[in-house]
Swiss-Prot record:
The lineage of its organism: Eukaryota, Viridiplantae, Streptophyta, Embryophyta, Tracheophyta. This is Putative F-box protein At3g17620. PANTHER family: BNACNNG10540D PROTEIN, F-BOX PROTEIN CPR30-LIKE. It holds the Pfam family F-box. Residues 1-45 form the F-box domain. Signal peptide: none annotated. Gene3D superfamilies: 1.20.1280.50. InterPro entries: F-box-assoc_dom_typ1, F-box-assoc_interact_dom, F-box-like_dom_sf, F-box_dom, SCF_F-box_component.
Length: 398
């Protein structure tokens, strides 16, 4: 029997179990459960997961307000093989909270920050460790207010302290409050922030090296000839200093009607998708250096005329995407080509030399929200809840 194998050999075998099946393996045998919690096994298992990522992407997808672990396989696409996108497991918790509709997910160091559709509930989740932490808002929520959330960490000498940032835009008062939550102390604090910029409520931040980046614009833009001239730039929140950095330049010059979206590359670089409304020309740029106070951009990663391919512009707020640097392709997640009455969710795979493929993600039940995708890398990060017992979550094969 497998349970009778020597520990080192058993550890080697278990390390090959996919993340989605690890929880089931833990409950198969008491010895396996004990072994799976040891640091040596965790290190080996995460190394095995890193090896598997060389052949396919692991992402988290929000579809129909549910959260799925999804694999994207692009092997052989330039040699006649079709790409594949498969939902492998649904992320749920053990206390019935899988019935809650999730509208947004953010990833940082293996942790997922999930926001409920009605903005009343926020949860931090580590699917690898099956841990969840529900955050209680510091003040009552108001339906007419807007919220922007982000997750990151403070760098200590020997550890990382995870934090959640929340913007509360009080609609009636035209006032924005910035709050930060420390997972370790289980407490909210209000930050003293004075800004001459603003982040739109629909803007999605991207976490990188423990910090979060957004597109931002002037709070008081110039107006001439009755036209508003907004200037867009990159803005970083440093979770260690708990301060926003200076304005960082973009490699493009978007207008209000253009599509501009952020993504991460291997949790080391930022990528920008930029598509003009007037001619549907799409560009992808990638950073060569990215820090809270400095950014450098590579030469153009990809440039494609989308008019003969899709003949429509991706949504201003919904164009979530990933890129494969080696294969020189971008995967954009949106609705089908019927702009007025879409019936299906679709992944558009676009590359050099005219490469173009569509992958049907199934019928859509949400006419407003496009599929939302963010990168996911499993980690052994612990969710600490101020001494309180953590609730458990799990992966269920879809």
């Amino acid at each position: 029997m497998m349970s009778d194998l020597p520990r080192d050999l058993l550890e080697e075998r278990l390390s090959r179990v996919p993340v989605k099946s690890l929880r089931e393996a833990r409950f198969t045998c008491k010895n396996w459960k004990t072994l799976s919690k040891k640091r040596s096994f965790t290190k080996k298992h995460l190394a095995q997961e890193a090896t598997s990522r060389e052949s396919e992407f692991k992402v988290v997808m929000v579809l129909h307000c549910k959260v799925y672990l999804t694999s994207i396989n692009l092997r052989g696409i330039h040699n006649g093989f079709d790409p594949s996108i498969n939902r492998q497991a649904k992320l749920v918790s053990l206390n019935g909270t899988d019935q809650i509709d999730i509208s947004e997910v953010y990833h940082c160091d293996g942790l997922l920050l999930c926001i409920s559709k009605d903005y009343t509930r926020v949860v931090v989740w580590n699917p690898y460790r099956s841990q969840t932490l529900w955050l209680k808002p510091s003040s009552p929520d108001h339906r007419m207010d807007w919220y922007i959330c982000a997750i990151g960490y403070e760098k200590r000498k020997s550890s990382l302290r995870y934090k959640v940032l929340r913007f509360v835009d009080f609609a009636e008062e035209e006032f924005v409050e910035y709050e930060i939550y420390e997972l370790k102390s289980n407490s909210w604090r209000v930050l003293d922030v004075t800004s001459d910029w603003e982040v739109e409520f629909y803007a999605r931040g991207v976490s990188l090296k423990g910090n979060t980046y957004w597109f931002a614009t002037d709070k008081f833009p110039e107006i001439s000839s009755n036209l508003i001239h907004s200037v867009y730039f990159l803005l970083c929140f440093n979770f260690t200093s708990e301060r926003f950095g200076p304005r960082l330049h973009l490699p493009c010059y978007p207008m209000d009607v253009d599509t501009v979206s952020l993504s991460s590359v291997r949790e080391e670089q930022l990528a920008v998708l930029f598509q003009r409304k007037d001619n549907l020309h799409m560009e992808i740029w990638v950073t060569t250096k990215i820090e809270p106070e400095e950014v450098m951009w590579s030469k153009l990663f990809l440039a494609v005329d989308m008019q003969p391919l899709t003949d429509f512009k991706f949504g201003i707020a919904d164009a979530s995407f990933i890129i494969d640097e080696e294969k020189k392709v971008v995967v954009v997640f949106a609705k089908d080509k019927d702009v007025m009455y879409p019936t299906h969710n679709t992944a558009y795979i676009i590359g050099e030399d005219g490469y173009y493929k569509e992958v049907d993600l199934g019928k859509t039940t949400d006419k407003i929200r496009d599929p939302l995708v963010c990168s996911y890398v499993p980690s052994s990060a612990q969710i600490k809840q101020g001494g309180k017992r953590k609730k458990k979550g799990k992966l269920i094969t879809d």
